[in-house]
Amino acid sequence: MMSAAPSPDPSLDNEWKEWKTTFAKAYSLDEERHRRLMWEENKKKIEAHNADYERGKTSFYMGLNQFSDLTPEEFRTNCCGSSMCRGEMAPDLPEYEDLGKNSYLTPGRAQPE
């Protein structure tokens, strides 16, 4: 007996359409179902995380974004090519620099009381 492949949740149709419009997403007929199911899975993970946030178990809130239709592998492959994603944010910066020494900073203006 074969199990049926998952089907998109019809109660999310309007939210899915709004998300696609917001992020200018368009898919071929073949890809639409796959992207919708991935989006729904990511939405559930986000909602579970945010429930933990509301209970004080995590320190940040999550939301749907332009990457919400990607698998984790697709995100890593397509969106994490930058040095920031690899943990190399600024390897050549000095540990400390006095910005006032080279006049990078100017004195503050007088503020009314």
From Swiss-Prot:
Which terms in the Gene Ontology molecular function aspect does this entry carry? cysteine-type endopeptidase inhibitor activity
Organism name = Mus musculus
InterPro entries, A to Z: Papain-like_cys_pep_sf, Prot_inhib_I29
Q: Which Pfam families match?
A: Inhibitor_I29
Q: Which ranges does the UniProt record give for the sequence repeats?
A: 15-17, 18-20
Protein encoded by which gene: Ctla2b
Q: Under what name is this protein listed?
A: Protein CTLA-2-beta
Record's keyword annotation contains NAD = no
Q: Which family does it belong to?
A: To the propeptide regions of cysteine proteases.
Keyword set, alphabetical order: Repeat
Give the function comment from the record: Not known, expressed in activated T-cell.
Please give the residue ranges the record annotates as the region 2 X 3 AA tandem repeats of E-W-K.
15-20
